[in-house]
Regions:
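N-terminal export/assembly segments and adjacent metallocofactor-ligating motifs
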Residues: 1-337, 341-342
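Intrinsic low-complexity, intrinsically disordered segments enriched in polar/basic residues
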Residues: 9-15, 374-377, 381, 540-548, ...
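Non-catalytic alpha/beta scaffold blocks inside enzyme catalytic domains
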Residues: 186, 224-530
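A generic alpha-helix preference that emphasizes hydrophobic side chains
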Residues: 27-28, 62, 141, 192, ...
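Long, low-complexity segments enriched in small/aliphatic residues
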Residues: 520-553
Length: 553
């Protein structure tokens, strides 16, 4: 028996592996049962690819199921591997600005209605990761905490990723054709369409909007600033002849009086903090310090009030009385205004300080009242305050009661169409629910928005707007001071800027970038290099004429 086994091993040189002892006996019933259950049938590829019902009805074993999954996964992976063919030529010497791991910085600007600043964007491998102040621009160069955090909204997954028509994803061509049909239909009915925007402070955008209104005369452009300074703008217009705001240089003032003006916060677009702190440097040891005196009258605690030397709590009504008392004292008028002993003492201190420091003093107010703003302008002109800059600030241009008139007409059904750009009036205005219902009843409504907010969600059309770090732009925050915004990354989603869309609607052959470049070469640069200004992010033109204070009687 041993000889037989030995011969068999010698003859069968091919190795045989057994999974269990039962496989030694080829006649075993257990072996036949195992062979029927394991790899018994061929993989039904036709059923996988073509017959879904047959696949579901098939009695599939666990191992066959794993085959199906493996096949489908492999097929999907192979299909995804088919990418576009990109022809590239390698660099002989690799440029420093595209070396992996080394960050690049680009100058751009932000103007979202709240913050206005020239900034530097740090990018790594083509992705913006951090915001810095552009210190080369002496004005509007401060990036506050909100500006620093704005890079996060670029990567927000809740952004609208494509245009929408009646709540459904669409294309830009379809959106454009639908919008043109509705605009023409409303025009034939002589219906009124309101274009509601923030203050753009952009000369090129303002020109594009004028071209749109020329093509569609039934469109009325109304400016809505979420943090308004409407009566300050109106007072400035009455005093200086055009819409704008007084710009203050607090570094030139040794005595500052503020009546509810949070100039270290959002007041008039911010940006006052750098020059304010430059005149508040205590250095008694070397006697080189400069410390201005700051008196703050306000109702709520603000960042400005927290930094004041003297902070006096007062209601808005009391603030108006305090301001009237200061005005009368400085001008030498008889004042019969009644104040509490504490308020009168501090108001007298403020008035005496203004008289003592004269042109080295300044008074500002954030009260949205026409009479208050008239008093402020007249008082600063009376003392010839050096803090009044020669150029007007253009970050707020909403004036008067045009927004109130718009709301009334919208609720009364006198408006046929509405276009909003970067605004959420349903959320920010007081009669939000009524406005929401009125917008949903309009024949035509279009919202340019990054998110499907309270306003855009009830609009007929939603135009997916890009992030400011994906956009081109130009701004004039202050007379003669121009700033450029450039994209620091390719658009992450299927978005389009408001300006590009309007240019396509009015039939322009140029895109927004080409329009900005042409406008600047013709009206701004005066022969300067476009690339140099784009690199720096700003350009300043000297202004020869001074602001002339000539108030209406």
């Amino acid at each position: 028996m041993e000889n037989v086994i030995t011969k068999q091993i010698i003859v069968n040189k091919k190795k045989t592996y057994w999974k269990n002892v039962e496989q030694i006996d080829k006649k075993s019933a257990l072996i036949k049962d195992i062979e029927n259950k394991e790899f018994a049938n061929q993989l039904p590829v036709d059923k996988i690819l073509l017959d879904q019902e047959g696949l579901e009805a098939d009695n599939t074993t666990r191992r066959d199921f794993l085959k199906y999954v493996g096949f489908s996964t492999t097929a999907a992976a192979l299909a995804a591997c088919e990418g576009p063919v990109i022809k590239s030529v390698p660099y002989v010497v690799q440029p420093e600005q595209i070396r992996p791991g080394i960050a690049n910085y680009y100058a751009t600007a932000i103007a979202d209605g709240f913050d206005f600043a020239s900034i530097l964007v740090k990018t790594r491998e083509g992705r913006p990761i951090k915001i810095e102040s552009n210190n080369d621009a002496s004005d509007f160069c401060s990036a506050n905490a909100r500006v620093h955090a704005s890079v996060l909204s670029l990567y927000d997954t809740k952004r609208i990723q494509t245009p929408k028509v009646r709540g459904q994803d669409s294309s830009w061509d379809e959106l454009k054709s639908e919008v043109l049909l509705d605009l023409n239909a409303v025009s034939k009915k002589q219906g009124k369409v309101v274009l509601l925007t923030q203050t753009f402070a952009s000369p090129t955008t303002n020109k594009i909007i004028k071209d749109l209104v020329t093509k569609f005369p039934n469109i009325e452009h109304i400016i809505l600033d979420t943090v308004p300074s409407s009566y300050a703008v109106e007072s400035f217009k009455d005093a200086y002849g055009f819409e704008g705001l007084v710009d203050y240089d607090f570094s030139k003032s040794d005595f500052i009086v503020s009546v509810d003006a949070d100039f270290l916060g959002d007041w008039q677009g911010g940006g006052y903090d750098t020059k304010y702190v430059s005149n508040r440097v205590p250095d008694r040891k070397n006697r080189k310090g400069r410390m201005s005196k700051h008196v703050q009258f306000e109702s709520n605690m603000t960042l400005t009030g927290a930094n004041a030397d003297i902070r006096v709590p007062a209601t808005p009504t009391e603030q108006k009385k305090i301001l009237s008392y200061i005005y009368s004292e400085v001008k030498g008028l008889n004042s019969k205004i009644k104040l509490s002993p504490e308020q009168k003492e501090n108001a007298k201190f403020a008035a005496d300080g203004i008289k003592k420091f004269g042109s080295k003093a300044v008074i500002v107010s954030g009260l949205d009242d026409k009479n208050v703003q008239d008093l402020i302008l007249d008082l600063n002109n009376h003392i010839r305050s050096l803090a009044i800059e020669n150029s007007a600030r253009l970050t707020r241009t909403q004036s008067g009661n045009e927004v109130d008139v718009f709301i009334k007409e919208l609720l009364d059904g006198k408006i046929s169409g509405l276009i909003t750009v970067g605004l959420n009036p349903v959320y920010s205005l007081s009669e939000g629910e009524k406005i929401k219902k009125a917008i949903s009843d309009l024949d035509f409504s279009l919202s340019f928005s990054m998110k499907e907010d309270e306003t855009s969600s009830v609009c007929k059309y939603i135009a997916a707007a890009p992030h400011y770090l994906e956009s081109w732009g130009d701004y004039e925050f202050k007379e003669g001071q121009y700033f450029l915004a450039q994209p620091t990354i390719r658009p992450l989603f299927n978005t389009m800027q408001f300006q590009d869309f309007v240019l396509s609607v009015i039939g322009s052959s140029k895109d927004y970038y080409a329009t900005i470049k042409a406008f600047w070469k013709q009206n701004v640069l005066n022969g300067r290099s476009w690339n140099k200004v784009l690199h720096d992010g700003f350009y300043k033109k000297s202004k020869k004429e001074k602001l002339k204070f000539n108030p209406k009687k």
